[in-house]
C-alpha cells in the first residue's frame, strides 16, 4: 500500500516488538539463575543449555524465512506463520519455568522447552520484520514504521528488565516465583504478539517471484 500508515496501524504493528523485546531479554536475564538456584543444575550445564538455542537459530531461522516467503507467494499473506509463532511462544515460554524435575532432568526439560520457545519466536520474528516493506512502497514510510518498531522494542527490553525480576521476588522467589513470572510474561507475549499477527491479514505480502528452497536458504 502506498498511502501513509495511520497511527493505529503503526501501534498495532510495533506492539509486537514489545513481545520480541521481552522474550529476547528474560531468558538471558533469569534462566541461568533459575536453573542453578531453583533447579539445582550445575552452572556449566546451565550455561550450555542457555547457549543451545543460538546454534539452533542459525539453522532454523533461514528455514522459516524460506517458508514465510512460500506462504506469502501462495496465500498473499504471512499471517498463518505469524499466528503459529504468536500462539506457540507463550506456551513454550511458560513451560520453561515449570519444570517438575531437578538436576539433570531439569536441564533436559529447560533445554527442550527453550529450543521450542526459540523456534516459536523465529516463526513470529522472521516474517514480522518483513512486514514494513509490505506495509508501504515508500522508503520514507518504511523507515517510519521501522523507527516505531525499534522504539517499542526498547520499551519491551526495559519492561522485561524491571518486571520479570520483580515478579519473581514478589511471588516468593524459588520455583514458585519463577513459575508465576513465566505465566505473567506468557500472558504479555500472547497479547503483544497476537495483535500484529492478526493485523497482518490486512497487509498484502510481496515475496520474491521464486522464494528460496531449504538448501539455498541455509547457504545464505
Indicate residue ranges for each PLM-predicted region:
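Membrane-embedded alpha-helical bundles of multi-pass transporters/translocases
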Residues: 1-220
